[in-house]
Curated annotation (Swiss-Prot):
<keyword id="KW-0460">Magnesium</keyword>
<dbReference type="InterPro" id="IPR023943">
    <property type="entry name" value="Enolase-ppase_E1"/>
</dbReference>
<keyword id="KW-0486">Methionine biosynthesis</keyword>
<comment type="pathway">
    <text>Amino-acid biosynthesis; L-methionine biosynthesis via salvage pathway; L-methionine from S-methyl-5-thio-alpha-D-ribose 1-phosphate: step 3/6.</text>
</comment>
<dbReference type="GO" id="GO:0043715">
    <property type="term" value="F:2,3-diketo-5-methylthiopentyl-1-phosphate enolase activity"/>
</dbReference>
<comment type="function">
    <text>Bifunctional enzyme that catalyzes the enolization of 2,3-diketo-5-methylthiopentyl-1-phosphate (DK-MTP-1-P) into the intermediate 2-hydroxy-3-keto-5-methylthiopentenyl-1-phosphate (HK-MTPenyl-1-P), which is then dephosphorylated to form the acireductone 1,2-dihydroxy-3-keto-5-methylthiopentene (DHK-MTPene).</text>
</comment>
<comment type="pathway">
    <text>Amino-acid biosynthesis; L-methionine biosynthesis via salvage pathway; L-methionine from S-methyl-5-thio-alpha-D-ribose 1-phosphate: step 4/6.</text>
</comment>
<dbReference type="GO" id="GO:0043716">
    <property type="term" value="F:2-hydroxy-3-keto-5-methylthiopentenyl-1-phosphate phosphatase activity"/>
</dbReference>
<dbReference type="Pfam" id="PF00702">
    <property type="entry name" value="Hydrolase"/>
</dbReference>
<comment type="similarity">
    <text>Belongs to the HAD-like hydrolase superfamily. MasA/MtnC family.</text>
</comment>
<dbReference type="GO" id="GO:0019509">
    <property type="term" value="P:L-methionine salvage from methylthioadenosine"/>
</dbReference>
<keyword id="KW-0479">Metal-binding</keyword>
<dbReference type="InterPro" id="IPR036412">
    <property type="entry name" value="HAD-like_sf"/>
</dbReference>
<dbReference type="InterPro" id="IPR006439">
    <property type="entry name" value="HAD-SF_hydro_IA"/>
</dbReference>
<comment type="subunit">
    <text>Monomer.</text>
</comment>
<dbReference type="GO" id="GO:0043874">
    <property type="term" value="F:acireductone synthase activity"/>
</dbReference>
<dbReference type="GO" id="GO:0000287">
    <property type="term" value="F:magnesium ion binding"/>
</dbReference>
């Protein structure tokens, strides 16, 4: 039986256009001024130091780091430092009511149902844990963070690496075969399956012909009790 469900965010619980058309531009417009103003204050100072280590340039100036961050955004680089800074900037946007975290309408009822069935729910996204909590804490449906038992980001490992899913299974103390991973990206599902997890691919638009994973269009198409472990 399935004892835990780990879900992706972009394209799975939330429209990817919310991230790319709302969140990313919001952070991009404010990034340079934000970093310049807070470069000597924590946690930004430590994040910038981590970025210097990430790019192997310990003497990089703040201006050079800002340029690097813009390059990372252009490349959609899954940089832990970039994600951390974006999360801090987004916090202000959520708190100020500039936007709310998008949820597909089928998501909340399914999460509540699975939680009531005794299934532990987790989030795994390339966005920082802080950013994940903001999206679900200030969602279209209000604060739903109480539904989740934990959150994972790139600190646990990259989403297309098999070891990341082994790490998650070990961390939550559930056998991989009793964990269901939900994502719209088949390469992530491949990695999870190789680690022994059960997988389902969310198809919110056109089908993915390159994928060999079972596909569903929305959360209410998913019945964890029918998934054999």
């Amino acid at each position: 039986m399935i004892r835990a469900i780990v879900t992706d965010i972009e394209g799975t619980t939330s429209d990817i256009r919310f991230v790319h058309n709302v969140l990313f531009p919001y952070a991009r417009e404010r990034l340079a001024a934000f970093v310049t103003a807070r470069q000597y204050a924590e946690p930004v100072k430590s994040i910038l130091d981590n970025l210097r280590n990430e790019i192997a340039r310990p003497d990089a100036s703040t201006a050079e780091l800002i340029e690097t961050l813009f390059t990372f955004m252009d490349e959609d680089r899954k940089s832990t430092a970039l994600k951390a800074l974006q999360g801090i900037i987004w916090h202000d946007g959520y708190v100020n009511g500039d936007f709310t975290g998008h949820l597909y309408p089928d998501v909340l009822p399914a999460l509540e149902k699975w939680k009531a069935q005794g299934i532990d729910l987790y989030v795994y996204s390339s966005g920082s844990v802080a950013a994940q909590k903001l999206l679900f804490g200030y969602s279209d449906e209000g604060d739903i963070t109480h539904l989740f038992s934990g959150y994972f980001d790139t600190h646990i490992g990259a989403k297309r690496e098999t070891q990341s899913y082994r790490n998650i299974a070990s961390y939550i103390g559930v056998a991989p075969s009793q964990i269901l991973f939900l994502s719209d990206v088949y390469q992530e599902l491949d990695a999870a399956e190789e680690a022994g997890l059960r997988t389902l691919q969310l198809i919110r638009g056109e089908g993915d012909g390159a994928s060999r994973h079972h596909q569903v269009h929305q959360f209410d198409d998913i019945n964890p009790e029918q998934i054999l472990s």
